[in-house]
Amino acid sequence: IHFFYLGLCLLTLTSSAAAGPETLCGAELVDALQFVCGDRGFYFSKPTGYGSSSRRLHHKGIVDECCFQSCDLRRLEMYCAPIKPPKSARSVRAQRHTDMPKAQKEVHLKNTSRGNTGNRNYRM
C-alpha cells in the first residue's frame, strides 16, 4: 500500500508539469514530502535561513505554497530536513582512558587517592 502512495505521488508530481498546475493537500502532501525527503524527514514551515525575508512575510509554510498554490519538486525539497553528518569517532585520548584494564585503573586510583605523589609506580 505504501508503494501505491509513492507511485501516486510521483505520478501526481510528474503529471503536474505536463498537465498544468496541481496542488497537494493533506495526506497527498505528506506522502509527497515523505517520498522526496526520505529518511531525512521534513518541516511544515521552512527553517530559518531559507529564502528572503520578504518571502517569509508572504508564505507561512508548505500548505500555503503547495496546497493553496501549486508547487514543484524543488519547492518540496526546501522543506526537507538537512542531512545529518555522521557521528565522529571518539578521540584517542578518551579511548586510552576508558580502555585501560580494570586492575590498572584500581591501582592508579588507589595511588592518587592516598596522595602518593612521589615517583613510585605500582604495577600489577
Curated annotation (Swiss-Prot):
Alphabetical UniProt keywords: Disulfide bond, Growth factor, Secreted
Cross-referenced InterPro entries: IGF-I (IPR022341), Insulin-like (IPR016179), Insulin-like_growth_factor (IPR022350), Insulin-like_sf (IPR036438), Insulin_CS (IPR022353), Insulin_family (IPR022352)
Disulphide linkage map: C25-C67, C37-C80, C66-C71
Organism this protein belongs to: Coturnix japonica
Primary localization class, coarse: secreted
Gene, per the UniProt record: IGF1
Pfam family, one: Insulin
Region listing for A, in residue ranges: 61-81
UniProt protein name: Insulin-like growth factor 1
